[in-house]
Amino acid sequence: MSVILYTTHCPKCMVLEKKLKSKNIEFLENTDTDLMIAKGFETTPMLEVDGEIMNFVAANTWINAQ
């Protein structure tokens, strides 16, 4: 499973990072804002799991289900 957290280290970003770590989910952290803009992201955090992009709410739901 490929998990990428797109983050600017904002408070919501840190919540997702903490939850991923608490569930022992391995993830890569991406802080490249140019890439985020190129992907069409208007907010952070965003979570990508096996190519599926999730916003904060969807990412929380996914993490909680793991």
PLM segments and residue spans:
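Short secondary-structure boundary/hinge segments and terminal tails
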Residues: I37-A38, M54
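Structural micro-motif
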Residues: K39-L47
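Local sequence-structure signature of Cys/Sec-based thiol-disulfide redox active-site neighborhoods
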Residues: M1-F27
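Non-catalytic, surface beta->alpha helical segment in thiol-disulfide oxidoreductase systems
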Residues: E48-Q66
